[in-house]
Amino acid sequence: MYKTKISVYPSCLSTLVHNDVTLSEVYDKIKNDDVLRQRTVNYRKAIEAKLPAKQLKKLKAEQFPMLMPAARFKEGRDMEHLDSYTGLCQCDIDNIPPDMMAEAKRRVRMLKFVAMFHVSMSGNGLHIYYFYQIPNEGLTPQVYQ
């Protein structure tokens, strides 16, 4: 589980250049990277300042890394460049009321299948990563034929 590598792109705009990193490395960056922390603070301030959704989307796309938890790619981010599946999935829960966040985190911690979770960039949600078994592994290419 901790050796599984996922593709992480510098931003949502990047389609070719990426790093393959473990969940432990992702978690460490989220918790300890000063640049990422400052960008998150700035993003949350932009939300509080009620910047238009279009500007927030642009800021998010340009300033934050993009994780691809479900699959690894050799080059581009499309089926043509699919290298392998990770067996990992991300659940994104948005709009958690502030008075319920601690309870939501407590409950997620209790789930045995959860590999990692963190608070979302907005501060109002959770990104939850979990492993699943791939049914009929290897049949996916047939779907696209």
Report residues per predicted region.
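Helical (often loop-to-helix) elements that flank the catalytic cores of nucleotide-handling enzymes
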Residues: 101-110, 132-145
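Short hydrophobic/aromatic beta-strand micro-patches
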Residues: 92, 129-133
